[in-house]
Amino acid sequence: MLRISAAIRIAALISVLTLPVSFADQRTANWTGDFPPCNQRFELLKRDPMSLGVKIATSNPILAHEFREALDFWAQVVDMNWHEDDSNSCAMQLVDGTPAILKTSIVARSQFTEWDNFQGLIAFNPKAPLTNGEFYLTAVHEIGHMLGLKHNPSIHSVMYYLDLQGNEVLDESDLTTLAEHHKLKVGSLNEPVAVIEP
């Protein structure tokens, strides 16, 4: 019995040792769609000040407005400026998501800069029954992903994965992660930054 137990432990150890260093280190592929890629998308990877051309390609004018407001918010936090660019020379593009991209109950989805097939795309359901404020908070959240942020387990963070309420912040964890990727305009990483719709 002892030999069987030892053999099982050795087999388990061998199988663990043959796995990649970390599942998190494995590259994951971004979703794709029938959209032209943004040719300047790698501007989003710069640590230096960024100048982002943004293509607003949505059929929903309210979403377009709130997305612009969300970009203005990020321009106060990260050392970046943005301008509209309707060409493929954009760095980021807001598109109307298809059912293949936005599964049931998913309102928006961003691509991740570090994943394969990154094209600079953020997809929204233009018919989602959201208020202006909900479009704004969701846009801030999705742009945050493009700037290097992951989901945050704190319900107070705008990067929380579910049900944004309107009193969210960028917390110390969010700001610290942002500072690893980009120059920031905020004075302190310890002071939460309120995400308030203008």
Regions found by a protein language model. Give the residues of each.
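Residues that form or immediately flank small-molecule/cofactor binding pockets and catalytic motifs
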Residues: S59, S87, P99, D163-L164
